[in-house]
Structures are given as C-alpha cells and as structure tokens.
C-alpha cells in the first residue's frame, strides 16, 4: 500500500 510500511505495498 505504501511500499515500505505495509507488506501489501
């Protein structure tokens, strides 16, 4: 979703 805070990017 964010690329660094979440695993779903």
Swiss-Prot record:
- Which superkingdom? Bacteria
* Other comment: On the 2D-gel the determined MW of this unknown protein is: 15 kDa.
Q: What is this protein called?
A: Unknown protein 1 from 2D-PAGE
